[in-house]
Regions:
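Signature of uroporphyrinogen-III synthase
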Residues: 1-193
Length: 193
C-alpha cells in the first residue's frame, strides 16, 4: 500500500531574457527542476548552450529530449564537479540551480579556478504534510524532501533514499536508512520491495 506526496513545491523564477539570449559555453544543471524552470522563460531552440552537463539520469534524459545532447552526466554533483575540473574546456560555467542547493559543486569548481556564474532558476518551498503513524517507510528523492517531511513528522520510520546526498540529510534524524544502488526512482522502489 503506497501513497505519494512531494513535501515540496517548486516554482520557477523569471530569468532575464538578456541572460538567456547570450551564448553559454558550459552549462550545468543539477536537477530536472532547473531545466524545467529555464524552459518556462525560453524555448530550447532559443537557448545557445554549447556544452550541457548535468546530474542524474532523469535530468540527462529530459535534457536529451529538449536539447538533443548532453556533454556529460554523473550521478552526483561532487562527481560532476570532479569531472569538470579534469575534462571541461574553458574556465567558466553557468550553473542553473534552486534556492536550496548544496554548495559542493560550486565550491569544488571555484577551488580549482573555474569561474561559476550561478543563476537561481527556481525556488523550493518546504510544504510538510502529516503522514499517518502506521506508515513504515518514506522514500526521499532530495535533501529538501527530508527537511520538509521532518517539519510535520517523526523520524521513527525507514528512510529510503535515492542517493548518498539525500541519505546524509536523513542520517542526522533517522535510525534506519536504505540507499538505492543506482540513483533512480525505480531503484528506490526496488529497495522498498
Amino acid at each position: 500500500n503506497a501513497d505519494s506526496d512531494d513535501f515540496i513545491k517548486i516554482s520557477p523564477n523569471r530569468i532575464s531574457p538578456i541572460v538567456l539570449k547570450k551564448e553559454h559555453k558550459n552549462v550545468v544543471f543539477t536537477s530536472k527542476n532547473a531545466v524545467e524552470a529555464i524552459l518556462t522563460s525560453s524555448s530550447a531552440a532559443e537557448l545557445k548552450f554549447e556544452n550541457i552537463y548535468c546530474v542524474g539520469r532523469k535530468t540527462r534524459r529530459f535534457i536529451k529530449n529538449k536539447f538533443g545532447k548532453v556533454a556529460h552526466f554523473e550521478n552526483s554533483a561532487t562527481d560532476l564537479a570532479k569531472y569538470l575540473v579534469e575534462f571541461m574546456e574553458g574556465s567558466e560555467i553557468t550553473y542553473f540551480h534552486g534556492n536550496i542547493s548544496l554548495e559542493d559543486l560550486p565550491k569544488i569548481l571555484t577551488e580549482n579556478n573555474i569561474t561559476v556564474n550561478p543563476i537561481e532558476a527556481y525556488r523550493t518551498k518546504l510544504s510538510g504534510k502529516k503522514i499517518p503513524e502506521e506508515v513504515k517507510g518514506i522514500m526521499f528523492f532530495s535533501p529538501s524532501n527530508v527537511e520538509s517531511y521532518l517539519k510535520e513528522n517523526s523520524a521513527d520510520k525507514i528512510a529510503y533514499c535515492i542517493g548518498e546526498t539525500t541519505a546524509n540529510a536523513a542520517k542526522a534524524h533517522f535510525k534506519e536508512i536504505k540507499v538505492a544502488k543506482i540513483p533512480t526512482v525505480e531503484s528506490v522502489i526496488d529497495l522498498v520491495n
